[in-house]
């Protein structure tokens, strides 16, 4: 069942991706540009943003820190001034460092909150007035299967991704009646600079290009939650529905932690 308007045609759509200097964000920006979208990329890495703009004619690069509220607002104003509207906004900025309770680091916890969750709130603050005024558009937040239930090494990361899932669900309830689409992306393991920090063999690891294709397919199907690769994510989705005792036993057995 389609929960959002299906997006099959990207030509001329103004798409803003925050966190697009590498990994999933960069791969998605490239594929959207190839499909004719007017792509705006933002990230802290100014050199990467400039490189994308110079190599993708018609695109716009705006370097910013996702944790800078004023910069996010100014970027949205710049996009509207240049393009007249924002049709699609994707928040894919992220921070990840493995953490367990025995090595609790409050500063690192708050860094995860700032980048992964509060940055998304800053994007909403910048684009929601535009989308509501337009009575059209789409918001998409990149969460993770780590947001489904607690996982070892995900003490800092997992709660921020769970918050994004809840945020997207609530946004959908509020914005769908206004004609605005909302989706949440829940990837498994994708080969990015963030997952490179893991010291274990990641099951069902995929490349960012495959992740981007899955996302575009999900938007084309009008899905609310887009999760992949399904050979891995379906298992974790099923585990959301088992009792706590069984869940903890299964996770300990398969992770060894």
Where are these predicted regions, by residue range?
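Conserved glycine-rich cofactor-binding loop
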Residues: 21-22
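Conserved glycine-rich Rossmann-like NAD(P)H-binding loop of the short-chain dehydrogenase/reductase
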Residues: 35-51
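Substrate-binding pocket helix/loop in short-chain dehydrogenase/reductase
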Residues: 100-113
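Active-site helix of classical SDR
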Residues: 124, 160
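Residue(s) in the substrate-gating loop at a strand-loop-helix junction
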Residues: 144
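C-terminal helical subdomain
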Residues: 184, 200-235
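Rossmann-fold cofactor-recognition segment
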Residues: 55-70
């Amino acid at each position: 069942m389609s929960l959002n308007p299906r997006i099959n045609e990207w030509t001329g759509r103004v798409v803003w991706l925050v966190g697009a200097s590498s990994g999933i964000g960069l791969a998605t920006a490239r594929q959207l540009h190839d499909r004719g979208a007017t792509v705006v990329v933002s990230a802290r890495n100014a050199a990467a943003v400039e490189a994308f703009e110079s190599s993708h004619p018609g695109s716009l690069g705006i370097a910013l820190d996702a944790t800078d509220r004023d910069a996010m607002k100014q970027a949205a104003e710049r996009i509207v001034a240049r393009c007249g509207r924002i049709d699609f906004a994707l928040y894919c900025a992220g921070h990840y460092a493995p953490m367990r309770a025995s090595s609790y680091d409050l500063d690192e916890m708050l860094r995860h909150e700032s980048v992964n969750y509060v940055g998304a709130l800053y994007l909403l603050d910048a684009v929601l007035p535009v989308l509501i005024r337009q009575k059209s558009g789409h918001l998409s937040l990149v969460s993770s299967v780590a947001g489904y239930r607690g996982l070892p090494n995900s003490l800092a990361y997992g709660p921020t991704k769970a918050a994004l899932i809840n945020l997207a669900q609530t946004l959908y309830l509020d914005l769908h009646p206004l004609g605005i689409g909302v989706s949440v992306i829940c990837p498994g393991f994708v080969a990015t600079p963030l997952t490179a920090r893991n010291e274990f063999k990641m099951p069902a690891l995929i490349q960012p290009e495959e992740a981007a294709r899955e996302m575009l397919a999900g938007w084309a199907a009008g899905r609310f939650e887009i999760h992949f690769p399904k050979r891995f994510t379906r298992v974790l989705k099923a585990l959301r529905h088992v009792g706590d005792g069984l869940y903890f036993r299964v996770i300990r057995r398969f992770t060894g932690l």
